[in-house]
């Protein structure tokens, strides 16, 4: 479905992504983990063309693109199949929940208003917010705002959704409602690439984990193998730090990791 090869991205003289290779199959839920500053968000932004890569190729549904020389028309064709959920919601403050969900459908996709409204209400219902269709962002909690953002992504019928730390801006008491929606999407077969520090989500919902450090992917494993059989010392240290702060009990294997580091 999605394959990236030799992705490079620099800001000035600082190389942020150092020749990344990755693949995502239909139905995959891929957790992108790693310490702050490892390039996780930049990776997502390059995949959705919010940043321009210096080099690399993308194969999306059999169509091959050179990421350095990709055209606006090609970008548009890929974006029609993708959606992006930002960590800070990025909602229009002066528009209702439904208007936020349908804005892109009407303006960018040129859908008839009636069809856009139907899609918008269906998407809001999927995230449990159909009753809040006429509420403005300031009338919603942070968790509800992020669910509106997810509904906006769903309304475009994407093949894959990119999530950039979707719970990092939320009060801890609101994180669960967003993760619950994401878990439901995973169960329904939605393909997702998720930058997150929510270890329980990565362990229990994702089927694949990518671990990044200093602009490189240093490990790609199934979620089970990543959490139960970490091999590199830096990954063991990372898990020890974040699992001690994550909610829920740890398995025997995860406790063993903490003891070994």
Residue spans for each PLM region:
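Catalytic Walker B motif of ABC-type/P-loop ATPase nucleotide-binding domains
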Residues: 161-164
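Helix-to-loop junction immediately C-terminal to a conserved catalytic motif
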Residues: 48
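Conserved ABC transporter NBD signature motif
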Residues: 56-66
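A short, proline-enriched helix->beta-strand linker immediately N-terminal to the Walker B motif
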Residues: 155-159
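ABC ATPase NBD coupling module
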Residues: 65-83, 113-114, 229-230
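Conserved ABC ATPase signature
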Residues: 136-140, 144
């Amino acid at each position: 479905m999605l394959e990236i090869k030799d992705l490079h991205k620099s800001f000035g003289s600082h190389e942020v992504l150092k020749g990344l290779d990755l693949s995502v199959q239909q139905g995959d839920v891929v957790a992108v983990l790693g310490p702050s500053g490892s390039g996780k968000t930049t990776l997502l932004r390059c995949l959705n063309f919010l940043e321009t890569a210096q080099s690399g190729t993308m194969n999306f549904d059999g169509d091959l693109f050179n990421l350095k020389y990709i055209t606006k028309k090609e970008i548009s064709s890929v974006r029609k199949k993708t959606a992006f959920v930002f960590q800070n919601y990025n909602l229009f403050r002066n528009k209702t929940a439904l208007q936020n969900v349908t804005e892109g459908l009407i303006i960018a996709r040129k859908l008839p208003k009636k069809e856009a409204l139907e899609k918008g209400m269906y998407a809001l219902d999927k995230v449990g917010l159909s009753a809040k269709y006429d509420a403005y962002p300031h009338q919603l909690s942070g968790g509800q705002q992020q669910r509106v953002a997810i509904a906006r992504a769903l309304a475009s019928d994407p093949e894959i959704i990119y999530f950039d730390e979707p719970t990092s801006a939320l009060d801890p008491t609101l994180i669960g409602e967003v993760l619950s929606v994401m878990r439901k999407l995973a169960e329904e077969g939605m393909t997702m690439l998720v930058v997150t520090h929510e270890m329980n989500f990565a362990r229990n919902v994702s089927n694949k984990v990518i671990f990044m450090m200093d602009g490189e992917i240093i490990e790609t494993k199934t979620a089970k193998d990543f959490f139960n059989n970490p091999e590199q010392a830096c990954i063991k240290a990372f898990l020890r730090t974040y699992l001690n702060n994550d909610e829920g009990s740890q398995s025997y294997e995860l406790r063993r990791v903490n003891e070994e580091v």
